[in-house]
Amino acid sequence: MNARIAEVQRKTKETEIKMVLNIDGDGEYKISTGIGFFDHMLQLFCHHGKFNIQVEAKGDLHIDDHHTIEDVGIVLGQAFLKAISDKRGIKRYSHIILPMDEALIMVAIDISGRPYLAFDVDFRLPKLGEMNSQMVVEFFRAFVSSAKVTLHVKKISGENDHHVCEAIFKAFGRVLKDACTIVDDKIPSSKGVL
């Protein structure tokens, strides 16, 4: 099997992002976005998905966190799409129901070539640490659009926003890793292409 590694750089007037993604890693990461809570969520994603990621993001945080978080989602999606290549042999589908204390989250994915996000999560507070809670859905919307995957995220229960968000990123890492697992040498579609 070829190494499933991708390097992506994106520079706009709002952000500059460099990322290296190894799908078949062991959970090592070096993450710097300037947004502590977001860094923590990406670390959880890497640890639970066993992805190796190096990301350095510089953005217009003097305005807010929107451009940085959204653009990291875009770059992660681009890196994933590049690393997964023609998707030959992957499992394609995965789902999980993951608890974190009182929070219970369902995440399901189809590496389909069709971008779609169903995000049924409400946060009680406007901020998660210094991160705008509305940016969680924007991160996933950006990832889904660039990675060309179908992703469902649903909060079954949860009172503590931190627990809910942690459970989402842990579950996301686990389902993405599982769906990327090589199970044979065929394209997982009756059409013969994804």
From Swiss-Prot:
| EC main group | lyase
Q: Which GO terms describe its biological process?
A: L-histidine biosynthetic process
Pathway listed: Amino-acid biosynthesis; L-histidine biosynthesis; L-histidine from 5-phospho-alpha-D-ribose 1-diphosphate: step 6/9
Pfam families according to UniProt: IGPD
Known EC number(s)? Answer: 4.2.1.19
Protein's UniProt keywords contain RNA-binding: no
Please name the SUPFAM superfamilies in this protein's record.
Ribosomal protein S5 domain 2-like
Compartmental location = Cytoplasm
Similarity comment text for this entry: Belongs to the imidazoleglycerol-phosphate dehydratase family.
Which HAMAP family does the entry link to? HisB
The protein's name: Imidazoleglycerol-phosphate dehydratase
Origin organism is Caldicellulosiruptor saccharolyticus (strain ATCC 43494 / DSM 8903 / Tp8T 6331)
